[in-house]
Amino acid sequence: MVTDIDKQDSPQFISLNILGIGNYSLPNRVTGRELLENDSEIGYASKVDKQGDTSDVVLAMEIDGELSDLATAITHDATIKFVNGSSVEGRSILRHSTAHVMAQAVRDIWPGAKYAIGPATEDGFYYDFELPGGAHFTDADLGRIEKRMREIIKEDQSFAREEYDLAEGAGLFSDQQYKLEIIQAVGENESVVVTGDESAVVNGRNPVVSVYRNMGVHSDFIDLCRGPHVPSTGYLGNFKLLRVAGSYWRGDENRQQLQRIYGTAFESPDALDDYLKRLEEAEKRDHRRLGTELDLFHFPSEIGGGLPVFHPKGALIRTILEDFSRQVHLSSGYLPVWTPHVTKSTLYAKSGHLEWYSDSMYPPMEMEGAEYRMKPMNCPMHILVYSSRSRSYRELPMRLFELGTVYRFERSGVLHGLARVRGLTQDDAHIFCTPDQLPGELESLVGFVLEVLTTFGFDDFEAELSTRPEKFVGDISDWDLATDALASALSAAEIPYRVAEGEGAFYAPKIDIHLTDAIGRRWQVSTLQVDLQMPARFGLSYVGDDNEKHRPYMVHRALFGSVERFMALLIEHYAGAFPLWLSPVQVLVVPVSESHHDYSEEVLLRLKEAGLRSDIYLADEPLGARIRKGKLEKVPYILVVGGEDVDSRTVGVNRRGSSKPQRGVPLEDFVAEAVSVASERGGSEQDRPE
């Protein structure tokens, strides 16, 4: 085992700045747990409570910004931040620790089980397994696993971190082929990109493998892991296993098929209950189910996975979105362009996409001695529009816009209705500008994005600023300039954001804007990137006021993300009960009997003349059945037409979400109301589902 740092190498006393508490001079090698339990000066954080609610309980700490176990020895002057269960970091630690307990329970029930990786996710955790003899988990097995997990939690087993060299680490996992592969891959290639459990192997001259050991009553459990973890399993009572799904080792369909168990964990029983209620509501709102129930779209097997076919109502919603997008872009100074769906591969070789993204592209096609590809990105073609002739600074900023369909070969395991498809249409814009124009363009662009998204009834936004990754092209100074400009635009818009270090694209830093839907879920929608690399690759220039050539800056931007994904978001946000301006059928006319058909047809004609999307259900079924059908289709207005209405030129108005129909409404009054509501756009409380 790798030994600790020699005590003689450390100073006798260290200076600690404990955030939120104060500055202290303490003996060296003090641990976080000792700080909490033994130092009376550290007030509110001095007790570790093991009750069911860990919202305010310290689970781990940050030492100079690096997350660590409470058992970690602090051997140098440092800034310390304690992490409680209700923080983002605390929840992640709770979930990852619970994933370990789940793997331990599976190993206890199926002693020959192989366990692969088990990370925390935004809403929970998962772990991938291979059961002996090709066995498969059942729903009943989830209950068995949960029962064993609660026994492990009751034992209050400690999470003990241990470090080994590569050979020792491999020996610990001699019967776990997936852990061995992780250790061996990192040991053989020190430049390997580490993900998941690979980050438990610290590269360098003497690579170190970190593991966590749980001391059980009957046996120990060890797992390859970077950590940190909660001090012991007793902190982990608020969890639920959710479902079983298939997965592939390394996400590669040619590798071993595994079984993935999903679960979630929270800091308190109330937080867990709230999440499970939201999950139940999310299932009711699932756009895949509503897409079928509302006759919006489907995915024919004859066409292939990830390639949706839109039915008339779904195509109408899509058309409304696209028409709205065109309108707001044209009125904001964007210039429309159109580019083909297929292009020569050499274009994407020049842009760098072929080198970096070929695995996500459809295979090449050979035609007339040249290789062609379905386009995965619109940007190289927009660059060709810009470079089709010389440009002057007077033409800048040039904002090019296209509703362009692109094709990406997503693996079948990650396809998810309209939210993850292989053929997607982006409301794609590329802005070419001078350096002086960049800050103003970005500031107005962020404002434009938020204004458009607000039109759809969203008002809770946050952003993520992704910075330079480990593998990138271009100069660091250019990256820093672009990153600073994006950060300034977010600050000017007063939108909260976090920095995702190293998660930018290979050619540009980016902003991802997230919004919160009606049941509190976060969705990523708009993306903005400042690109200093592609203009150089394509030799773009403009003639400045000094008559010299200069290189423009280029901004990539997709506002909806994709039309398909944005439709999925809207379907789930509104549970299919779209605001009036987005509803494929805005008004449904229902005559009480055949004798009212003629007037009902007149009503229908008047509605259509007013520009309202309308339909009629004639009296070939009972009245109640037709009204119920309209409600199931979530039509905003159902007009019931009876004998009194024929004589008085009125209608009976049933508004979605209201249990009280309004009788005897003059037809023209209703038309004026509906036209006014439809023109306002947005999503009001009346538009929310019952």
Region roles according to the model:
Residues 117:
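Conserved P-loop NTP-binding catalytic core
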